[in-house]
């Protein structure tokens, strides 16, 4: 039986970008499918999970939550993106110029996840970049971008990745991503 909207865990889910943990096929601890987090592959190094902000902590949406609330993974994804968009307002998301790049600031936790919001890149951030975007997301709370044709900006993104990666927490990617035709792809070496 589905829960009412007032008791729904899934309705509060926020899409959250996470690094894929290498899998050797042997689980460290056997866990029932219902107890595992809902995971949507983004690319070969990143995935989308769904978190519920419970003020004192963040809780992963698990497969059992989908079953209990009779919601599909695709519907969860739409809910998660909508709630991530709402976070840009409630967490005061803003773009801050920094040397040759633009930093996206939003109170920690969800900055890198903002690459999932097409509306930001197609409209809100368009005033900062004329061509294709280049973005670095080395950790969950770090997102910076520039025009992909601006070599000084690309170098600054590389420097940012190098600064964040060794000591970083909740690391995501050491790659620069290029947004072309509405999708993000790792920059070719």
Give the label of every model feature segment.
Residues 49-51, 105, 136, 146, ...:
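Residues in well-ordered beta-strands of folded domains
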Residues 42-46, 54, 98-99, 128-132, ...:
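Short, well-ordered loop/turn elements at secondary-structure boundaries
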Residues 86-90, 127-131, 164-172:
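Structural alpha-beta junctions
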Residues 1-113:
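Charged, alpha-helical interface segments at or near domain boundaries
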Residues 112-126:
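Short amphipathic alpha-helix segments
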Residues 141, 147-189:
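C-terminal structured domains
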């Amino acid at each position: 039986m589905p829960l009412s909207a007032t008791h729904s865990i899934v309705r509060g889910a926020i899409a959250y970008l996470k690094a894929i943990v290498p899998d050797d096929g042997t689980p460290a601890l056997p866990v029932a499918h219902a107890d595992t987090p809902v995971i949507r592959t983004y690319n070969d190094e990143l995935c989308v999970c769904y978190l519920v902000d419970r003020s004192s902590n963040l809780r992963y949406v698990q497969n059992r939550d989908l079953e209990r609330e009779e919601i599909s993974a695709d519907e969860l994804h739409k809910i998660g993106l909508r709630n991530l968009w709402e976070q840009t307002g409630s967490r005061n998301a803003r773009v801050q110029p920094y040397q040759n790049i633009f930093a996206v600031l939003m109170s920690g936790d969800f900055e890198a996840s903002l690459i999932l919001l097409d509306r930001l890149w197609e409209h809100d951030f368009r005033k900062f970049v004329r061509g294709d975007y280049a973005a670095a997301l080395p950790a969950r709370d770090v997102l910076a971008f520039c025009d992909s044709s601006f070599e000084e900006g690309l170098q600054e993104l590389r420097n940012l990745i190098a600064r964040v990666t060794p000591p970083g927490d909740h690391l995501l990617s050491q790659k620069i991503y290029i947004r072309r035709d509405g999708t993000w792809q790792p920059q070719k070496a």
